[in-house]
Amino acid sequence: MEIPYITPAKLLSTNVLPLNGVKTAFVCFCPMPSVFSKYRLNVEVNTRLFLHVHNMHIMFGQYGATKFIVITEVYGGPVGVTIVEELKHYGIDKIIGIGFVGSFDPAIKTGSIVDAEKSLIEHGTTPHYLSADTKYTFPTLKIELPQLNVNKVCIWTTNALYREFKSDIIEAKNKQCSVVNMDTSHLYAACELLNVSCRYFAVVSDMLDLDGAENWSNDLTDAINHNDSDISVSMSSLIDHIIRQLN
């Protein structure tokens, strides 16, 4: 079997995580959610840990006996799967993806929490991590959040943020999708191949009504600028509930 020419072991051979016993990672396809600050550990990082993410976008935290690393500002499939490969190199065996999605289902409104029960694949990053021709990728980590109102969804993983046309959305809806992002199928595919358990949750940041007069309602701008909104409240609640499941 062929092996890749470039590997995390080659690029990061002298690097180790500065905290022992870390097996869980939050990979955030968004800016650092403020709720993580209350779990932060004072850990000094002296070397760059990830090829595509600066150390200013990572932190270490702890809840009870569980230590974890948080990596933020991870955008798009290629960067996402690179982070997964590097986390595997560091001994991480559990990844929780966090991010935003856009909804085109009127029943799933801005501020709603979604659990990626599966994710529709587009041609691009994902197929490099699959051994079979399939339309969907699936989570391998079981996390239930019964205290929250969580929508089980199929996420359309698109490759081009500024190229979401009406015909594409109709096709995605016909394939069982109700929300869209650029991350989930790549994350699931990379984790499955590398034997890392994973589940992705997100908060709806914007909505598209194909039949409405104003087609797109946008709260994403506020969300990425950390402005107070229903989105930030939902994100804080979501992360708090996930962290309480870690022990």
Curated annotation (Swiss-Prot):
GO terms for molecular function: catalytic activity. Disulfide bonds: none annotated. One of its GO terms (biological process) is nucleoside metabolic process. Pfam families: PNP_UDP_1. This is Uncharacterized protein R802. It comes from Acanthamoeba polyphaga mimivirus (APMV).
